[in-house]
Amino acid sequence: GRSHMVLNSALEGARGGPGGEEIPERFSIPELQWMLSNAELAPVQADEPPQSRMDLV
């Protein structure tokens, strides 16, 4: 889905950027994943019934 595409591009940018594997501490990969997943899931959980979310997973 869209969230996976965004996450993959973010990870590729972090790994393949000018700094190579040097990732700024304020933008660690776990934090990026947490922020992206929360940004994607929070509105879905609030707006859609649990059954719809189960189908998406």
From Swiss-Prot:
Keyword list, A-Z? Hormone, Secreted
Q: Which domain of life is it from?
A: Eukaryota
The UniProt transmembrane annotation reads none
| Annotated region (Disordered), positions in chain | 1-26
Major location category of this protein = secreted
On whether Secreted is a keyword of this UniProt record, the answer is yes
Cellular component terms (Gene Ontology): extracellular region
Q: Give the molecular function GO annotations.
A: hormone activity
Where is the protein found, in the record's own terms?
Answer: Secreted
Family the entry assigns: Belongs to the somatostatin family.
Task: Please describe what this protein does.
Answer: Somatostatin inhibits the release of somatotropin.
Q: What is this protein called?
A: Somatostatin-2
Say which species the protein is native to. Answer: Piaractus mesopotamicus
